Amino acid sequence: MITAPGPTLGVVGAGQLGRMLAEAAAPLGVDVVVSDPTEDAPAAPVARDQLVGGFEDPETFRELAERVDYLTFEIELVDPDVLREISEETDTPVHPHPDTLALIEDKLVQKQRMAEAGIPVPAFFEVNGIQDVLDAAEEFGYPLMLKARKGGYDGRGNAAIYDRHDVESALEVIDGPAMVEAYVEYERELAIMGVKGEDEIDTFPVTETIHEEEILRETVSPARSDDETLERARE
């Protein structure tokens, strides 16, 4: 058990991200209590306590909210409606706001919002059936990437479509609300994290992420790229 003298932060999710968050919070005097469906989750040993409960369990959320000063989440599988309801009921602030979670948990809504904001994204279609995928193939050509709109991570919820013969099997793999994207050829993948305070937004250094079979295996910091590219990423 770790106890700090400052505020207490509740984190929904206790995976590797939750562990790193708790480790970073301790030197700042921030206590961390986590909740996760898995007992002895990665963040549990470095947090003050862990509650065991599902990501859509209102009772677990309520108990967590009543024990902390602020709530956050480290995984997108949380039900934003439940989180919003518990926050209002207990007057415990949630950051980011549950409305933000509702936006980012759905890949299609996320892509639509980014496109509306003028951020470059791969060409995409909403998928309600096989014809939508075939229409995308006619417009974009193969290969395509079929993605589950919700719940995908670490390669789960993705299915590559290299030709017409892959379409049915890809739809069977996803088996739910989906979107399809044009395939993007790239040299490397860069990632950047932004942080928002009361009156300003700042960024951490740009990193390079290396994936194998769609699972992150290595992060290189600082990213191996030219200054102009790094500045474009920050902007």
PLM regions: where:
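Internal nucleotide-binding/catalytic subdomain
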Residues: 157, 161-235
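Short, basic and Ser/Thr-rich N-terminal targeting/leader segments
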Residues: 5, 120, 154, 186-190
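ATP-binding N-terminal substructure of ATP-dependent carboxylate-amine bond-forming enzymes
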Residues: 1-100, 104
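Structural motif corresponding to alpha-helix initiation and N-cap regions
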Residues: 54-58, 80, 130, 164, ...
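A conserved helix-loop-beta module that forms one wall/lid of the active-site cleft
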Residues: 97-159, 164-165
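Structural detector of well-ordered beta-strand residues that form the stable sheet scaffold
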Residues: 33, 72, 93-96, 122, ...
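Short secondary-structure boundary segments
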Residues: 75-76, 148-149, 182-183, 196
